[in-house]
């Protein structure tokens, strides 16, 4: 099917390796390794059945070094992309959760938002990880992160369990990553408007100029990035999954060809080992080219 589509579109894919899961020579070794990884939770038969699905097969291919990264989700839910990754790839040392971050672009402006896709009601400690990992993702996309821990309260102006959670998470972030510019808990208007910041949060190095926004839960985060995308004119790149031992990224089941293409490049760029990686300027150029392609495609589709 891939070769037929390439021929029909007059694309040269001679340099591409296409692996057919149904005729994969290393399937027996893959089954044995997955049985071992699942530690008795799955039989050989169950593992073979799982590996007949592209999400598990692709994840094991990454685990065994047959691929450097994985981009899925076009025909699977986010849960079906993340579950195999958690079971087989697992989180990086020091990370307890997988989270996600969207990069939103409008002209020369870039902002980051997390966690818009994975953690429904993150705890204080979850928010700490989400903020620190989202700041790292923001840097990859050429953003110097100024992190706003969003709430309906600014520095104690409101009360409630959510306010306490965000305020405590902010304190923990400052202890865990003292080099990171972070403010919270803070309302959105105070995080982006210098005039409002002067009234609500004077003297803050983040208030009024935040560019990395961490939401208290997935309701606020998912609604927030979609408002920015649909009404604010931003182009959304992501979600970029964070905290895993290998780059695994998720697409929306409503994705188009441009989004698949763009996220493929981003995912591949994230898979380059740190000691071999292009410099920050080079990586930013790659990402910028991807974003520009998405924006151009969006204008063309209009």
Name every feature range the model reports, one short phrase each.
Residues 299-302:
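Short acidic DE-rich linear segments
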Residues 1-207, 211-279, 283-297:
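Anion-binding alpha/beta catalytic cores of soluble intermediary-metabolism enzymes, centered on
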């Amino acid at each position: 099917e891939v070769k037929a589509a390439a021929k029909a579109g007059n694309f040269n894919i001679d340099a591409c390796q296409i692996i057919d899961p149904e005729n994969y020579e290393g399937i027996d070794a893959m089954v044995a390794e997955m049985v071992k990884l699942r530690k008795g939770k799955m039989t050989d038969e169950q593992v073979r059945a799982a590996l007949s699905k592209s999400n598990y097969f692709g994840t094991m291919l990454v685990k065994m070094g047959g691929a450097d990264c994985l981009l899925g989700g076009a025909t699977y839910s986010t849960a079906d992309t993340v579950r195999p990754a958690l079971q087989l790839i697992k989180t990086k040392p020091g990370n307890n959760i997988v989270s996600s971050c969207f990069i939103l672009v409008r002209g020369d402006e870039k902002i980051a938002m997390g966690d818009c896709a994975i953690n429904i009601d993150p705890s204080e400690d979850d928010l700490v990880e989400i903020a620190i990992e989202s700041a790292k993702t923001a840097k990859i996309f050429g953003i110097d992160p100024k992190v706003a821990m969003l709430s309906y309260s600014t520095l104690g102006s409101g009360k409630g369990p959510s306010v306490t959670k965000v305020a405590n998470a902010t304190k923990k972030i400052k202890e865990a990553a003292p080099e990171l510019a972070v403010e919270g808990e803070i309302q959105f208007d105070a995080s982006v408007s210098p005039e409002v910041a002067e009234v609500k949060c004077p003297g803050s190095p983040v208030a009024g100029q935040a560019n990395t926004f961490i939401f208290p839960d997935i309701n606020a985060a998912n609604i927030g990035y979609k408002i920015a995308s649909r009404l604010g004119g931003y182009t959304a790149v992501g979600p970029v999954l964070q905290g895993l031992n290998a780059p695994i990224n998720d697409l929306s089941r409503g994705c188009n060809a441009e989004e698949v293409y763009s996220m493929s490049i981003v995912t591949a760029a994230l898979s380059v080992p740190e000691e071999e990686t292009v410099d920050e300027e080079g990586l930013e150029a790659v990402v910028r080219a991807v974003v520009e392609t998405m924006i151009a495609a969006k204008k063309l589709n209009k």
